[in-house]
Amino acid sequence: MAARKGRRHTCETGEPMEAETYDLGSEGPSQVYLPGRGPPLGEGEELVMDEEAYVLYHRAQTGAPCLSFDIVRDHLGDNRTELPLSLYLCAGTQAESAQSNRLMMLRMHNLHGTRPPPSEGSDDEDDEDEEDEEERKPQLELAMVPHYGGINRVRVSWLGEEPVAGVWSEKGQVEVFALRRLLQVVDDPQALAIFLRDEQARVKPIFSFAGHMGEGFALDWSPRVPGRLLTGDCQKNIHLWTPTDGGSWNVDQRPFVGHTRSVEDLQWSPTEDTVFASCSADASIRIWDIRAAPGKACMLTTAAAHDGDVNVISWSRREPFLLSGGDDGTLKVWDLRQFKSGSPVATFKQHVAPVTSVEWHPQDSGVFAASGADNQITQWDLAVERDPESGETETDPGLAALPQQLLFVHQGETDLKELHWHPQCPGVLISTALSGFTVFRTISV
C-alpha cells in the first residue's frame, strides 16, 4: 500500500494528527510525541487534527453510550470505496437506569471524505463553499426499541433473508431480535415516524434464553451454519444454540467445561463447522469441537496465553491465525498449526492499558486493528518489515523503539470499548466509546 510511507500518526481530543516533533532546545534532541509515553504536552499545548492522515473521519452520538455494536451487511454492494458512504449499525446502550436502555438500528449516510484546507478566494467562492458544506453534512437515522437492562454485547447475523441480532443483557438473559422492520424504517423517514409513534414499544425478542447463571459478554454466530450460536457467561459456562424449524432455538443445557473463570470472548472457526475458540479471565485460550460431549469438547489449551485476563480474540478469515488481547496490554498472534506449543508467533506491546477489542481486516490477511482502555486505536500489518539493506535507520529513539508493524495510532476517544472493520467498505473502521461512535479510514490502510 503506497500510502503507508513508514509514517505513524496519532490523534487526541477527537482530532487526528501526524506524529508531532517537539524541540527540547539545548537539553537534547527533538522527540516525537508517543501516546501514553510522552514527552508530556507543555502548558498551553494541545494536539490538533491533521486531516491529511485520514481519508474519512466522522463522529456520532446516540444519547446513552453503547458498550457494543455490530455492522449490518447491506445490499449496497461489496468493495465500496466511492464517497459518500452509507452504512448500517446495530447497537445496544448502557444507560443509567435499566428501563432507559435501547436496542438501536443506525443508518449513517452522506459520509464524505476529509477535505483539503480552504484556499483564499472571492466572496462568491465562499458562498459556494457554504452551500457545499451544507450538502456534505453527514446524516443519521435512528430506530430504537426498548430493552430492560444494559446491553453487554450485540452480534448480527442473517438467517437467509432475515437479519437478526443476538443480545447479551446485564440481567443475565440472551435474546434474539428480528431486525427486518428496523432496517426498513431507517431507509424511509415517513415509515420511521410511524414506527417511533406506534410500533417501537411493542417490539419484543423472538427468542430468549435465561439458562445462564448470570450475565455475560461472549457471543458469536457461526459464519458457516446459519443460526448456530455460542454464548458464554461470567460464571465460566458456554452454551451452544442450535436453530430449529419455526424460527426458534434449542439451547443445550450442558455447558462446555474447561474454563475456571469468566468467559470473555468466543469465535467460531471460519473454515470448520464444529470448531470454535474461547478466551477467559483465567488467562487461557481454548479450542473446542462441538462433535464431542460438552465435558470433553476442549481439544487444545494454552493455559497462560496472557499475564492476566484474556479479554478478546479474533479468528482470521484468511489465515490460520488467532489474534488475542489481554489485560496486560499485549496483542498476540497465534498460529493454530502450532497452537500446541503454547507460544505466539508474534507479540506486540503498544497499549499501556487493557486491550478492549481486536479484529482482523476482512480483506487484507496481515492487517488488524485493536483498541485499548488507554484510548488508543492501533492499526497493524504483519507484512511490514524494515529492510536492513536499505541503509535507512530511525534517528528518533522513540520511533526506533516502536514495532515495525505498527501503522497508525488513532486517539481522541474516551473509554473505548469495541471496534469493527466494515466488511463491504475496505479500510473503514468503526468504534464505540463513552464519547460516541467514530467512523474513519486512515491513509495507512
Curated annotation (Swiss-Prot):
- State its location(s): Nucleus, Nucleolus; Nucleus; Chromosome
A GO cellular-component term linked to this record? nucleolus
For this UniProt record, give its keywords in alphabetical order, as a comma-separated list: Chromosome, Nucleus, Phosphoprotein, Repeat, WD repeat
Sites bearing Phosphothreonine, chain numbering: T10
Q: Which domain of life is it from?
A: Eukaryota
InterPro entries documented for this protein: G-protein_beta_WD-40_rep (IPR020472), Glutamate-rich_WD_repeat (IPR051972), Histone-bd_RBBP4-like_N (IPR022052), WD40/YVTN_repeat-like_dom_sf (IPR015943), WD40_repeat_CS (IPR019775), WD40_repeat_dom_sf (IPR036322), WD40_rpt (IPR001680)
Question: What's one GO MF term for it?
Answer: histone binding
One GO biological-process annotation of the entry reads: nucleosome assembly
The record's region (Disordered) falls at 110-141
Point to the regions of Acidic residues compositional bias.
121-134
Transmembrane segments annotated in the record for this chain? none
List modified residues, type Phosphoserine. Answer: S119, S122, S343
**PROSITE patterns annotated for this entry?**
WD_REPEATS_1, WD_REPEATS_2, WD_REPEATS_REGION
Q: List the disulfide bonds.
A: none
Give the record's subunit note: Interacts with METTL18. Interacts with CDT1; origin binding of GRWD1 is dependent on CDT1. Interacts with CDC6; origin binding of GRWD1 is dependent on CDC6. Binds to histone H2A-H2B and H3-H4 complexes.
User: What biological function has been recorded for the protein in this entry?
Assistant: Histone binding-protein that regulates chromatin dynamics and minichromosome maintenance (MCM) loading at replication origins, possibly by promoting chromatin openness.
Put simply, this protein is called Glutamate-rich WD repeat-containing protein 1
